Amino acid sequence: MNIVLIDSRQTTKDVWKISASRQVEHLKTHVNVQVGDTLRVGVKAGKRYLTEVVAVEEQLVMVRPLHEEVVPAKLSVTLIIAMPRPKVLRRLIMDSVTLGVEKIILLHSYRVDKSYWQSPFLQQLDQYVNLGLEQAGDTIAPQIEIYK
């Protein structure tokens, strides 16, 4: 995780709350975040900020924005692929988002197994996009189109 991606509803005051359990656990165990440390925080579909940690609690990390950072420009790349196997789809979406692809189109072809379209992985695309955005340090998700 190269940035912490939060929803705009978490940024209503001078102090922002990072409350997603996955993010809080990562910050505490892997980053070993302490009060006074700086973190890169991005607002979904918005801007990216350098922030200072003001409080670390059991299920919550609170940060204060210091200044705005430049969000990297998207590559003007459209990735068109036939629906892959579900586990490959997860990796493909995360890696494509990390690379900065602007648009992803998933197609059906005669070689695609119809069961792939009923996979629970399709319901979790937003989670994989968020993981890719956090890895890339980006805040703007690519457009994903699905044609069966």
Report residues per predicted region.
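RNA substrate-binding interface of SAM-dependent RNA methyltransferases
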Residues: 70-148
